[in-house]
């Protein structure tokens, strides 16, 4: 628990002996991790690692960093928009958080929620259930599955420039945004709007980055998941 606390302090770039000492250890590990991530992405980009089709349209909602950036509420909102337009969506998730699964089932009870660590298998299962489109929660790094749209979320709460795991919370460098179709900077309430606008402006100056917009939502009242 103490190590986790110090790691969070390192990610927030706080001073002190603990984060500084941990940073000395984490820096070479982050460099190795970055090399592995870039190599993997390169192999997918050139086709050396294959990507397979789910045989129906796939929209992936993902992020670059670990932790919450609003993927779950955005996925639920997107599913409702698809239903209104006549689609029959399914939601595929890795199932790492039980609360997220319960929320999806509460928000859209008529929509199948498929738990599959191999997102491609989950997408194919949705086809067997008569679905005609899939929304994948946390699918950006699952490159084995082809998708029509990649939406990537960023939080203004994360410090920039990004640092890769374990030195920082990022799973991929910013250059990975170039394979997305849309980048959304999430503003949770009015207090984050100013910092979200600043991050959007910074991202729009980067070459090769796709469309970048702000997605703002207001937290609602507490509600029990058992109704």
Locations of regions flagged by a protein language model:
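Beta-strand-loop-alpha "switch" segments that mediate conformational coupling across diverse proteins
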Residues: 212-221
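Hydrophobic anchor at the start of a short beta-strand
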Residues: 88-89, 150, 212
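A structural preference for short, hydrophobic beta-strand core positions in alpha/beta folds
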Residues: 91, 113-115, 214
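A transmembrane-helix-recognition feature enriched in membrane-embedded lipid enzymes
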Residues: 2-57
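Walker A (P-loop) phosphate-binding motif
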Residues: 41-96, 189-192
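Short, intrinsically disordered, charge-balanced linker/junction segments flanking boundaries
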Residues: 225-227
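Phosphate/Mg2+-binding loops and adjacent switch elements
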Residues: 95-207
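Active-site donor-binding loop signature of nucleotide-sugar glycosyltransferases
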Residues: 63, 155-156, 217
């Amino acid at each position: 628990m103490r190590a986790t606390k110090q790691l969070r302090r390192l990610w927030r770039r706080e001073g002190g002996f603990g984060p500084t000492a941990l940073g000395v250890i984490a820096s070479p590990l982050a460099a190795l991790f970055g090399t592995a991530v870039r190599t993997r992405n390169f192999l997918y980009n050139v086709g050396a690692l294959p990507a397979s089709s789910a045989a129906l349209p796939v929209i992936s909602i993902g992020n670059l960093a670990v932790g919450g950036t609003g993927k779950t509420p955005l996925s639920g909102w997107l599913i409702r928009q698809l239903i209104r337009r006549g689609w029959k969506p399914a939601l595929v998730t890795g199932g790492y958080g039980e609360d997220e699964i319960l929320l999806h089932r509460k928000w859209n009870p008529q929509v199948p929620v498929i738990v599959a660590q191999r997102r491609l298998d989950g997408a194919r299962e949705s086809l067997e259930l008569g679905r005609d489109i899939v929304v994948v929660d946390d699918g950006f790094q699952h490159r084995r599955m082809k998708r029509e749209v990649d939406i990537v979320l960023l939080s203004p709460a994360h410090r920039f420039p990004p640092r890769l795991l374990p030195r920082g919370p990022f799973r991929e460098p910013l250059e990975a945004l170039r394979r997305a179709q849309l980048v959304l900077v999430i503003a949770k309430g009015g207090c984050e709007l100013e910092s979200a606008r600043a991050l959007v402006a910074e991202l729009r100056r980067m070459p090769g980055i796709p469309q970048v917009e702000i997605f703002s939502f207001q937290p609602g009242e507490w509600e029990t998941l058992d109704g």
